């Protein structure tokens, strides 16, 4: 019970996560990408939780959620292990682990960062062949 309470979030945060999930798009049939357009003090937490939650959907093996924080676009990446999100986000200046990674991109808007992420995902798969 203590663990469940620790992972709980308030209704406002839950609604934000639900909206992010509802806007998710699939690339390569199993990678979810979504955007959190609001800028608030908890953007990075909301994006991380949404990226985690996207992995609970069947057939999604990796997820990336982009959000605004100050003058940066933050990316939270998650994977069930089949796709190395660390390698993908390192190409955008980030880092982490095979199943959990993040990046902060400056000097680009949300659409540019999203396209750059898709380019890096394409590059990742072309290198796997």
Please annotate each region the language model reported.
Residues 1-129:
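Hydrophobic helix-and-loop "lid/oligomerization" segment in the mid-to-C-terminal part
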């Amino acid at each position: 019970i203590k663990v469940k309470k620790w992972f709980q979030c308030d209704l406002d945060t839950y609604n934000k996560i639900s909206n992010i999930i509802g806007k998710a798009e699939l690339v390569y049939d199993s990678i979810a990408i979504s955007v959190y357009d609001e800028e608030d003090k908890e953007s990075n937490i909301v994006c991380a939780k949404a990226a985690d939650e996207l992995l609970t959907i069947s057939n999604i093996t990796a997820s990336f959620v982009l959000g605004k924080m100050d003058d940066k676009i933050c990316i939270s990446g998650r994977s069930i292990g089949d796709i190395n999100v660390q390698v993908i986000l390192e190409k955008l200046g980030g880092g982490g682990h095979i199943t959990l990674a993040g990046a902060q991109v400056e000097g680009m808007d949300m659409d540019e960062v999203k396209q750059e992420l898709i380019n890096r995902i394409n590059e990742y798969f072309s290198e796997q062949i």
